[in-house]
Structure formats: structure tokens, C-alpha cells
Amino acid sequence: MFTSNTDDDRGQVGIGTLIVFIAMVLVAAIAAGVLINTAGMLQTQAEATGEESTDQVSDRLEISSTSGDFSDVNTLGAGEGEELEVTVEAGDATAAGEEVVIRVATSAESGFEDSKAIELPDEAGDPTTVTLDNLPSIGGALVTVDGENVQAVTEDSVDLTQGDPSVSFNVDELSDDSESTIGLQLTADAGNNFWDEIAEDNIEDTVTVQLTDYERTEAEITNVNNWGSDDAEIEWEATVPADEGDYAVEVIGFDSARMLPISTNEVASTTEDPELGETDTQIDNLQFSVATAPGSDAIDLEETSVQFIGDQGEETVTITDRNVENIQGVDGNVLTDNSDRALVSFDPVADIDGFNRIEESEDLTVIFTTASGASTETELRIPSTFLEGDESVRL
């Protein structure tokens, strides 16, 4: 009635079942590996995101103060819309890679893009070409290329009234950086009543003389002769940090543009029959005193971008060596300590593409963004009036 089992009657595992079992084990192992890898990847991403977020919070600039330098500009209503193509190349290896400023002498006519800052290619002989837009219609324009470490060169016969005007420059390094002077002597025509319209002690607030050099240096009155007579004379003098170079002198305040070519250690003389013109006061230099935020790592200012948003549009620029001045502790334009201070300056016309000088009552938002992506924003409120006698204003 009972049947005994033998070895031949034991249960057998089929090959198919064994394959399925092994496959399930492999799938489980692979799944475990994927989970481990995914967890590791997520952890790495989380750590990177955390570090990036920390950098964006900590590697940030602080702006301790903002200000603007202002000067008089002519509002002559001259013809506009001319373009000029300017090509510049370094004549030798020492001038290669230098930053230069191209300036067209316009007697500081308001609204014109008369300046542009560029960096020369790193190889001597390699040209770089830029276009200056919206220039006045001048038959014999004076165009200057100058840099902190290059010799100034001026072309004095550029006709902006002809189709597609262009000019080329070859610049060399300064051979001597000792200071020199440039002067202007202005004499009124006999019988002209120009000098009767202004007081002798108010000349400097009425007529301004400046150069087309790297920093657009403003000249100072050094002598006044025969005031009130038919041959009254005013003498101006400016100091430039080089003993060689050619520039243009611009006179601001007359009813028409006055520009003269001049070389260092020379005095230009002109006899005029001037009438007072319309002038305005506008900001031609924006300045920001910056430091690192507490806990920040070192910040390279030359890897920092600055966005300008205002009535004139929106434009982003990258800080260059030309824009940075060391106030305290800054080495190589890098802020390494919270006590380091730098002054970052911008010429609105030369440095910000499409911008002109900043007018009264303009609003401007400025955003500094470091290499880590950390941003610092400041709002500039331009006063509705500038106090007479002042040369700068806090913004």
C-alpha cells in the first residue's frame, strides 16, 4: 500500500528554471549597482550644487560707494549719423596686447559716440578694426589713439562727410614716460565783445579745454592777459604722463566746435572770433569702490562682468585692467582679503557700447557678476542738477 522513494525518484530542477533564477540574481545585482551609482551621482551633484550655491552667496562683491565725475559738453546740434572705421595694430611686440582708447575730437559734442576702448591683439602687426557710430559731419576730423603704455598718434585730416570713411593706426610703446606739458593760447579778435559776456573769475566755468589723450585730460588756466581789451588772451596748460605723442585740443563752450592738433611740449595758438554756445553738464566717468563680501574667496576683477541697464538701453561689459585702480591691498586686480579695496571706473562712451554720457535725472541699474555667478546690484540715481563748482557727485 505504501511506496518507498528511491534516488531515482528525487525532484529535478529544470535547466529553464535555473536560467530564470540566475537571470533574476543578475538583474537584482545590476539594479543594486544602479541604485548605488545613482545614489553616488546624486550625492556628488548635491555636493556640487551646494558648493556652487555657497560660492554664489559668498564669492560676492560689496559696493561701498558710487560716484560720478561730470564735465561740460557742447549742445551744438551738429549733423549726425556718420560712421568711422578705425583699424589699429601694434608696431612692436611691446605694444601688443595693450589697451588703447580711440577718440574723435568733437569739442565734447553731446550725444555722439566719440570714444571707444579696445585691446590690441597679442601679436604685433595683427590689426583690429572697430566702428564708431553716430559721429558729427566734420570734414577734417582729428582722431587720436592713445594708451597708458603706448605713444599717442593723431590723424588730423579724416573726412567724415565722405562715404565709408576709414583710418588706420600703427602704435608703438612709449620710449619715455616722463611728464610733459601741452598748452593752448587763445586770443580774441580785435573788436570782439566775447570777453565782455563773462567775468574774468568765471572763465573756467564757461570755457573748458581738454585733450584727446587716454584719460581725456582737462587743461587748467595758467594766465590771463589784457582782460577786457580787444586783444585779451587766455592761456591753458595740461600735463600728460609722456614726453612724446600727438593729440588734439578741444575747446568747449563756443557756438561751434574748435579742435586743434598739438604735440607734447608745444603750445598751440589760435585767434578766434567766438560767441558763447549752449552747454550742458553730464557724467563722463562712473566710479565704484568695491571689496569682497565677508567669507568670500579671492575675486579676480578681470573675470567679473558688469551689466548696465538704464534709459539708454542694456549692455554688459567685462572689467579690464584699464578700469581698475588699486586703493588698498589689490594685487593683479585680484581681491584676496576683505580689507582689499579697488576703484572700478567706466567711461560710459568708451567702455559701454551704445551709451553716451549720463545726463541729469537718468536712472541706471548696475549689476556686478563674479566668475562664480554671484551678483551684486546697485541702483544709481542721477541728480536733477549738479552743483556749480563741483567736479563729482555721489550716486
From Swiss-Prot:
Q: Would the keyword rRNA-binding turn up in this protein's UniProt record?
A: no
Q: Where in the cell is it found?
A: Archaeal flagellum
Which GO MF terms are attached to this record? structural molecule activity
Record InterPro entries: Flagellin/pilin_N_arc (IPR013373), Flagellin_arc (IPR002774)
The residues of the propeptide are 1-11
Which terms in the GO cellular component ontology are assigned? archaeal-type flagellum
- Is the Manganese keyword given for this protein? no
- Per the record, the major location class is other
> Per UniProt, which keywords does this protein have?
Archaeal flagellum
Gene Ontology biological process terms from the UniProt entry: archaeal or bacterial-type flagellum-dependent cell motility
Which family is it part of? Belongs to the archaeal flagellin family.
Function of the protein: Flagellin is the subunit protein which polymerizes to form the filaments of archaeal flagella.
Q: Under what name is this protein listed?
A: Flagellin B3
In its UniProt entry, the species of origin is given as Natrialba magadii (strain ATCC 43099 / DSM 3394 / CCM 3739 / CIP 104546 / IAM 13178 / JCM 8861 / NBRC 102185 / NCIMB 2190 / MS3)
Q: Which gene encodes it?
A: flaB3
